[in-house]
Amino acid sequence: MPKSVIIPAGTSTPIAPFVPGTLADGVVYVSGTLPFDEFNNVVYPDDPKAQTRHVLETIRRVIETAGGTMEDVTFNSIFITDWKNYAAINEIYAEFFPGDKPARFCIQCGLVKPEALVEIASVAHIAK
């Protein structure tokens, strides 16, 4: 099955061997997305809402570059560093998924940079 690499303009160059997204057989797989600027610096330290918005906007760019929309998202994996930020993260998350919500899970864990508060990976099925 052929796959296409998805790298939207303005996306940071990953600091590990992966790409922001891949498209295969109508499915977009978005790598774990952190609140990084194009130079891999964490944006909005100590602001879980702003970091979540930045992460979801980056995910949206990956999915739109592949030809989809956020309505095509079927699953999200959410990683947070502290449960105290859960409500703030969910508030912004709900703005990006106002209708039928995708399935998801959320766990607390450490992230690659200590200033990062949230990481999200997504799967979207693009209508053919």
Curated annotation (Swiss-Prot):
InterPro entries: RidA_CS (IPR019897), RutC (IPR019898), RutC-like_sf (IPR035959), YjgF/YER057c/UK114 (IPR006175). The lineage of its organism: Bacteria, Pseudomonadati, Pseudomonadota, Gammaproteobacteria, Enterobacterales. This is 3-aminoacrylate deaminase RutC. Keywords: Hydrolase. CDD domains: YjgF_YER057c_UK114_family (cd00448). Involved in pyrimidine catabolism. Catalyzes the deamination of 3-aminoacrylate to malonic semialdehyde, a reaction that can also occur spontaneously. RutC may facilitate the reaction and modulate the metabolic fitness, rather than catalyzing essential functions. GO terms for molecular function: deaminase activity. Its EC number is 3.5.-.-. Coiled coil: none annotated. GO terms for biological process: nitrogen utilization; uracil catabolic process. Belongs to the RutC family. One of its GO terms (cellular component) is cytosol. It catalyses: (Z)-3-aminoacrylate + H2O + H(+) = 3-oxopropanoate + NH4(+).
